[in-house]
Amino acid sequence: AHSPRCPSTDEDLRALFNGSWLDVEERQRAAVRQAVGRRLMVLTGGPGTGKTTTVLRMLLALSREHAAVTGCMPQLRIAAPTGKAAQRLAESLRQGAERLNRGAHPIGSDWMPHMHAVLAADAATVHRLLGSRGRHGGYAFHAGEPLPADIVVVDEASMLDLGLLRALLGALREDAVLVLVGDADQLTS
């Protein structure tokens, strides 16, 4: 489903992929291009296929798009089924950002506010993101009290059970962007 957002320009994509030489990056470029203007993106791939690099560039493009449309920097959230997985994604994004900034063709300074927004994103379990009430049941964020997030990335999405995924989808604002990341060959919960 497309949202009423401005499309990312080819110039923006060239800036994000400046100096690229790997064939695999054409698929990454296509994934980033497809994410812009959509409310839901599913990114799959096995270990070492560049999912984290793609997510970083996708978040930068989505952040830039959000700022262009709203005039505000987005509220970004990073989550995973486990705290360890969420922290691993946050650390991988930090390492990817360092590589983007120190390569032969670092991204331009106009991308830095978006880079800072991505790196400042809170990493949490999906339960914590939703404000789990523990043994009392339910979540603080739901359809009546939506999650204060413009862009949400969930890593290892195949490990989410259907109840938790339903709660997450129900807690998102109508204009929020959800990026589900995972390995199609990973065992589901």
Model-inferred region functions:
Residues 1-189:
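Conserved ATP-binding/catalytic motifs of P-loop helicase motor domains
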